Amino acid sequence: MNFIFISPAFPKNYYNFCERLKKNNVNVLGIGDTPYNELDIKVKNSLTEYYKVNSLESYDEMYRAVAYLAFKYGKIDCLESNNEYWLRQDAKLRTDFNINGAKIDDVIAFTSKSNMKEFYIKAGVPVARYKFCTSIEEDLEFINKVGYPVIVKPDVGVGAQATYKIKNEDDLKNFYNYDHQVPYIMEEYIEGNITSFDGICDSNSNVAFCDNEVFPPSIMDIVNDNLEVSYYVNKEVPMDIYDAGSRVLKAFNIKSRYFHLEFFRLTKEKKGLGKIGDIVALEVNMRPPGGYTPDMINFAQSLDTYQIYADIICYDKIINVDMNHPKYYCLYFGRRDRLEYKYSYEDIKKIYPFIQMHERMSDALSSAMGNEFFIARFEYKEDMDKFKEMVSKKKNEE
């Protein structure tokens, strides 16, 4: 099997996908913009060959790279970046070279937020009302129906970038003062906590492996206001999340992919959507959850999600991972450089020696993930909450 992996050096934990594929005797061929001599040795060792391009943004360069690798190694069986930013380009390359996997028409369905709505409805999952941002007058008609606040965000975009809460007519006018280069949609505001259904599905859109994360109420506010970020991997997947997530995968006809499906769990009843505790669709992301979340899943479930991915790609089932291991909660806490914290890493390590990771976050991901992060796992949620309290404590706090 020939597998082209796009950008194997970034994010820096993604070499693990290549390494596990190679372990399964896959010919892993990398394309990236990092000079070969600057690649980490782990990335180099996970690849059969690496083709450097000047820019991953240049489709002509990417096309030539794939053509070269196909000429040298024969038919390309898979091409993937597992990165939201490159999903459409991945799909176009698959389409142009007739490579297995989601083609460009398929990917539009799960990268466009407006298209997502129709598939959520098909899956029987409630979804927030929306419209395209067209003019102040037409937007006000929508707001008169759903009330303030409303959320505006690019119809196609990554994470919470360029997402805003419109609280009044002045905010709306201010939004239109800027020349937005891409289509925006406006959604009714949902009061709820964000929770996700993450995992890997097989070639028949069946869940092969899954987990659940619980996030802060607003990633948008974290990005826009440079706030701290904290979220955790749950010990178990709630049944309503599993049921809704499984139906969404079938509705989108997702095959042999890592997925990250986001939902609101309502904290306030919303007419037409649900009662407190019900779930409402947020977004579909057909790639792994961001940052080091795949590693957090590994820590929480005592397994290797990268190997699960490789097994599904190669065998369409899990054969190299023992799924019967103890499960834990796993917390991520991202600190901000602008804040002064009471306890250093050394202080925290003395009390919590089982910290799994402590590093600086790359600048490219820091807006949503913080500048310095801690990842730790716990048998009990109460211990996780105490750890979070210590890590977040500021110098001026009692």
Task: For the regions a language model picked out, list residue spans one by one.
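A short, structured active-site edge motif that brings together acidic residues
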Residues: 103-114
